[in-house]
């Protein structure tokens, strides 16, 4: 799903005046466009950022300048640039994140992106096509996905509101524990983590249609508005 973020900013749904579009996946979210100067912050997601003349400032006010950076999970940072950028935020425990961040490079230091990743992120193609290419290149688990997990993912993507592990498991004939095990085997994360990313996606879609924060939180299955506000902030560093 592609969501125009500028429309949300114009409706007063976000404090940050980002101008561009979002694209969601099972364990990631991609943004392309103009970013606003943000405060020093950290989030759970592994972050990749690409563009012209990007300055990344860390918690020690040390600045790095370049065209592409990998920011590990939990590292405080600030990104500034006057040019359009691409940002990719990924569930840090997923196979996708592990493939993009080889074990020898893991740590708490901002690192330069490889030329292959940088070229893919900056390719002049639709955002979804760019992500499909990146996932094809860096999907670590190449085994054939279990048909039951495919059914669970299909059902998750077909429902409009309030997804739960119990609901998805019942629909495809799997116990909660079995669905968790299958998801962890194929994606590297339990199915509950995939649902969180889906909930953020659903909430953003509701906001794009004009829903209030409270209604968007309800539509996506968050406990309340405060829960919805906290999850995107902690996960991807964006506060609705």
Q: What feature does the model see in each segment?
A:
Residues 1-15, 208, 230-240:
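…primarily DNA-binding HTH/wHTH and HhH modules…
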Residues 12-104:
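N-terminal regulatory/effector-sensing and dimerization cores
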Residues 30-33, 133-141, 180-188:
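Short, Lys/Arg-enriched N-terminal segment that forms or immediately precedes the first helix
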Residues 96-159:
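Amphipathic alpha-helical segments enriched in hydrophobic/aromatic residues interleaved with Lys/Arg
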Residues 135-164, 171-172, 193-211:
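A short, Lys/Arg-enriched amphipathic alpha-helix from helix-turn-helix/homeodomain DNA-binding modules
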Residues 166, 185-223, 229:
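Terminal helix-turn-helix DNA-binding modules in bacterial transcription factors
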Residues 177, 226:
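Key DNA-contact positions within bacterial/archaeal DNA-binding proteins
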């Amino acid at each position: 799903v592609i969501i125009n973020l500028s429309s949300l900013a114009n409706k007063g749904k976000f404090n940050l005046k980002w101008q561009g579009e979002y694209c969601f996946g099972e364990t990631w979210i991609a943004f392309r466009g103009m970013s606003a100067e943000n405060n020093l912050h950290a989030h759970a997601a592994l972050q990749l950022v690409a563009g012209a003349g990007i300055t990344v400032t860390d918690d020690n006010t040390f600045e790095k300048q370049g065209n592409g950076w990998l920011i590990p999970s939990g590292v405080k940072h600030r990104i500034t640039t006057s040019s359009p950028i691409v940002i990719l935020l990924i569930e840090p425990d997923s196979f996708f994140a592990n493939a993009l961040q080889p074990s020898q490079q893991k740590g708490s230091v901002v690192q330069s992106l490889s030329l292959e990743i940088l070229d893919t992120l900056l390719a002049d193609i639709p955002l979804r096509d760019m992500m499909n290419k990146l996932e094809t290149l860096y999907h670590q688990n190449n085994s054939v996905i279990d048909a039951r997990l495919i059914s669970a993912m299909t059902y998750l993507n077909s429902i409009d509101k309030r997804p739960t592990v119990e609901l998805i498991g019942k629909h495809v004939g799997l116990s909660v524990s079995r669905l968790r095990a299958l998801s962890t085997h194929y994606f590297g994360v339990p199915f509950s983590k995939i649902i969180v990313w889906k909930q953020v996606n659903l909430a953003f879609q509701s906001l794009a249609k004009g829903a209030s924060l409270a209604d968007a939180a309800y539509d996506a299955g968050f406990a309340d508005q405060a829960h919805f506000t906290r999850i995107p902030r902690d996960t991807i560093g964006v506060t609705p």
